[in-house]
């Protein structure tokens, strides 16, 4: 935010926030007249109201009141190169001038597919769609077409999009089409697979829980589940929508097996809506229109603008770029802990590459459900305090870095985090 805003100290972080964001409040009121939450994504909603942005440039976002924020959310980790990254802007703009979509093939789609097949070890063929949720649906259709079965198994605290069944499965609730088991519990997963082996078309797992507090599985868990799937003809699907940014070949490159299918999204669209399903050629063949066992289609699937932007994004996410964003996140982790210690606060963190989550209690190593966090009230107030210091994290206490950021900027972020903690202390938000 502006310097004047940053030195503001009123009765609470909430009041500081409201005084600095009157334009966002006005847009919230206007939006509520025609939309349920003045937006289309619940993930960024927070009280008293979310910000309304005007533009993004590089590492920064600018709201309608003219306040500047360091973008530590990257549109849910998807903008790995920051906002309006020039190579992506150039690629998308050039394609826009030639057309946005048509009922025929396009060369950028094939070029992006070639890049992904060359880069990701488990992918021999790939299909594109328009979101991670669509990618899940497409993969499930492929698995059903291949196996003739209907149900799927996922992890409690897992996330594979916003379909009703996946939302329930993430909460550990069984339904007519889905089953779930605790993430990392090999015995529980194998028991469900054995009990329902004749019903299961697919098992979906993340190599790291993107919405579950960045929890990593215990050694051998993924392989044991994969081997059980192989024994019973069940399609094993690895969800790398979030984790592709963590290594040149995604986290799948560190596994000692290759999943049957892989879900992709976020960074492969260069900031445009995108999803993808890749995997073994024999599995993807079930959507061949000459002998279809499952349907793959969509009005904007594989559109040339998204594909051109995605190719630029993937091309510029080199091993060196990934090392850079990982180092910046490590710098933030150390800095956040140091600032918390200076304030006499115990801060716990989880960092996987360029993804960092922070907690005001010891979360252990297992999955985290945001709704059950004992520090949720503090996190909500800290979020507003960070916004008032010109920092834009995810409301659920997570941040990420982008390739356009620098070490010097991370120093500023750490300083802003320290000032946000001071705000909480001054107004009784954290003892």
Question: Where in this protein do the model-derived segments appear?
Answer:
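Conserved N-terminal phosphate-binding loop of PLP-dependent enzymes in the Aspartate aminotransferase
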Residues: 2-431
